Swiss-Prot record:
NCBIfam families given in the database record: nramp, Nramp_1
Tissue: Expressed at low levels in roots.
Name of the protein described by the UniProt record: Metal transporter NRAT1
One example GO MF annotation: aluminum ion transmembrane transporter activity
Length: 545
């Protein structure tokens, strides 16, 4: 480690895949990465401590799997189709783990997050298009948070849902303000409430004792029987795999200090994979328990007429019905508090994801409260209109619709991610396994085909059964099919366009750049990377968790 003490902070430092901002001083680096060095003996940091240093990004992403949109789609799937759609959750979670791992790896290997790489690679007009799609994804995901929080206020304060929608503006700003006094403490409280809700569903599950054979069949035997099964499956998939999480995860890993050697980068990728897997397993079990509880109660033979009516139009407002065996009369209060925590925690991740997207695509940043206010006001408009016109039932349908929209927006974040992960111009020799990439591409195109087929089938079915004049149907068809064609053209463009911008910097070139900058030439540039301060993103170091 000789000579490193003379180094000072530099404005821009070369990293695998390009340039990152602000490297901390070497003294600070040594203090945080070395346990002790006495009498010439260097003690290596234990692996468990290295792993704990990487905990956080996957957990924050996994919290999004417990948001109001997931709860709503899980309950609807269970109430309408019992255990038939459990396989969608299994496939969705495996796919989510795969692509979120790719997103984390991309950030670690390149020193940039996905939105920044898109800005550097694509023409300006393409970036504007991708930015708009990404922002729409954030807004689409914020709508369920608005309605979930409004339902929580409705249960706790006995106010109309539309009034709760208006209150969500102030509640979220208050939460962001409180976060300034201790983000980790706030997140711990939110996580405690959410795991309380998870414990309630697990307890209800043990009380109901569903048929293990039926649950296993629903999880491993794909089936889409019955009217609305395809729509529910797409909504389930969209609620699990959200586009903004790809941008968020690739940015969160940059707040950790990762040395620049290939060995250290691969080790960091392994730690992030383990952390993400553990968080996703917990989220998977909770989602399965919600579906099974809803399916067991709403499809029971001894269901009362009142409960049957509730299950026929199950919303977040009527969910306490599913927990009464465990919590009794207190089920409403406990569930409402947990639902409130769920909506608020996901709002925080949405806000930070929005910051990452705006900074990456447009190279601009705004204060968290301003960013949250803009997103929330836009999300409130449809939520308020639907809750006034259609009440709780319409609000529940809007949550399902927003999840379906997320599924259609996913390819515009997913395709650039898959291309960059396997591009030698972006990650050099650190490309992903060919098997991983092939599986990811197959699943991605299967999703695109299913989405397109469902959209065409739904529109044709509506066209056949509506009572509009022929000229009106003709005009609408022209617009709809033009949008479908534009959607497919955009997907094809992103898929087959070759990467042109090289951001990966090989080791010899990095060593030469160091010499040209006035540094000391080294014999083994790769080994020298181990001794240098680990560059990291100070602009992302204040990320939640």
């Amino acid at each position: 480690m000789e000579g490193t003490g003379e180094m000072r902070e530099v404005g821009r430092e070369t990293l695998h895949g390009g340039v990152v901002q602000s490297v901390s001083e070497t003294d600070e680096y040594k203090e945080k990465t070395i346990d002790s060095e006495k009498d010439g003996q260097f003690r290596v940091q234990p692996r468990w401590r290295k792993f704990l240093a990487h905990v956080g990004p996957g957990a924050l992403v996994a919290i999004g799997f417990l948001d109001p949109s997931n709860l709503e789609t899980d309950m609807q799937a269970g109430a309408d189709f019992k255990y038939e759609l459990l396989w969608v959750i299994l496939v969705g979670m495996v796919f989510a783990l795969l692509i979120q791992t790719l997103a984390a790896n991309l950030g670690v290997k390149t020193g940039r997050h996905l939105a920044e790489l898109c800005r550097e690679e694509y023409p300006h007009y393409v970036n504007i298009f991708l930015w708009i799609i990404a922002e729409l994804a954030v807004i689409s995901d914020d709508i369920p948070e608005v309605l979930g929080t409004a339902f929580a206020f409705n249960i706790l304060l006995k106010i109309p849902v539309w009034a709760g929608v208006i209150l969500t503006v102030f509640s979220t700003l208050l939460l962001l303000g409180v976060q300034r006094f201790g983000a980790r403490k706030l997140e711990f409280i939110i996580a405690a409430f959410m795991f309380t809700m998870a414990a309630c569903f697990f307890g209800e599950l043990s009380y109901l004792r569903p048929s293990a054979g039926e649950v296993v069949k629903g999880m491993f035997v794909p089936s889409l029987q019955g009217k609305g099964a395809a729509a529910n499956a797409i909504a389930l998939f969209g609620a699990i795999i959200t586009p903004y999480n790809l941008f968020l995860h690739s940015a969160l890993v940059l707040s950790r200090k990762t040395p620049r050697s290939d060995k250290s980068i691969r080790a960091a990728c392994r730690y992030f994979l383990i952390e993400c897997s553990l968080a996703f397993i917990v989220a998977f079990l909770i989602n399965v328990s919600v579906v099974v509880v809803a399916g067991s109660i709403c499809n029971a033979n001894n269901l009362s007429p009142a409960d049957a009516n509730t299950c026929g139009d199950l919303t977040l407002q009527s969910t306490p019905l599913l927990l009464r065996n465990v919590l009794g009369r207190s089920s409403s209060v406990v569930y409402a508090v947990a639902l409130l925590a769920s909506g608020q925690s996901t709002t925080i991740s949405c806000t930070f994801a929005g910051q990452v997207i705006m900074q990456g695509f447009l190279d601009m940043k705004m204060k968290n409260w301003v960013r949250n206010l803009i997103t929330r006001v836009i999300a409130i408009a449809p939520s308020l209109i639907v809750s006034i016109v259609s009440g709780p039932s319409g609000a529940g349908k809007l949550i399902i619709l927003s999840s379906m929209i997320l599924s259609f927006e996913l390819p515009f974040a997913l395709i650039p991610l898959l291309k960059f992960c396997n591009s030698s111009k972006k990650v050099g020799p650190l490309k992903e396994s060919i098997y991983t990439v092939v599986i990811a591409w197959i699943l991605s195109f299967a999703l695109i085909v299913v989405n397109t087929y469902f959209l065409v089938w739904t529109y044709v079915d509506w066209l056949v059964h509506n009572n509009l004049p022929k000229y009106a149907n003709g005009l609408i068809s022209v617009v709809v099919f033009a949008l479908m064609a534009a959607y497919l053209v955009a997907v094809v463009y992103l898929t087959f366009r070759k990467d042109t911008v090289a951001t990966y910097v090989p080791v010899p070139e990095r060593a030469q750049a160091q010499v040209e900058a006035g540094g000391t030439p080294v014999v083994d540039a790769s080994a020298a990377d181990e001794d240098q301060p680990a560059p990291y993103r100070k602009d992302l170091a204040d990320a939640s968790m």
